[in-house]
């Protein structure tokens, strides 16, 4: 097995530069072919939303994995308010079936092509303002190793049970 090259990225009220948000954005911009985002609470700030949609516009295959229904009422509405913009940009949104809650938190870039220098981040940080600035969080950056392959396999397992959101119904 390949050795994993890891770096811990802490964040919280004592970190005024929002290191997790900056690293999430950096990984999104790093993606060349494929980007996978997985978060139970995907409520991006303007910079992350712009980074993700721009990745689509430059030809990156972007997948977002979320719960079909979040376990918190307000989060569910906040998260779903971004779906139209994401779908219009070309993001493929996969919803983990209700009543289960997808609680994994990770991002992978270019996992299918080792020549593209795949990267992965996982940890306690959701992709929302609370995790980026209010809560104390720890995220691990994986720059090399078989952990990236394991997360890519996890994505395949999720995709097998998820429903793809193709459009929003407006009533």
Model regions: which residues?
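Charged, low-complexity intrinsically disordered terminal segments
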Residues: 1-169
């Amino acid at each position: 097995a390949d050795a994993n090259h890891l770096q811990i990225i802490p964040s919280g009220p004592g970190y005024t530069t929002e290191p997790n948000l900056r690293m999430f954005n950096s990984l999104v911009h790093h993606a060349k072919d494929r980007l996978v985002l997985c978060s139970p609470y995907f409520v991006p700030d303007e910079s992350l939303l712009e980074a993700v949609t721009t990745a689509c516009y430059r030809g990156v295959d972007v997948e977002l994995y979320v719960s079909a229904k979040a376990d918190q009422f307000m989060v569910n509405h906040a998260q779903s308010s971004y779906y139209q913009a994401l779908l219009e940009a070309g993001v493929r949104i996969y919803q983990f079936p209700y009543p289960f809650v997808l609680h994994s938190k990770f991002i992978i870039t270019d996992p299918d092509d080792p020549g593209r220098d795949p990267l992965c981040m996982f940890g306690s940080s959701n992709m929302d303002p609370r995790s980026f600035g209010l809560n104390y969080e720890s995220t691990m950056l994986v720059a090399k190793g078989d952990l990236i392959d394991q997360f890519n396999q996890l994505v395949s397992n999720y995709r097998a049970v998820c429903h793809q959101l193709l459009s929003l119904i407006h009533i």
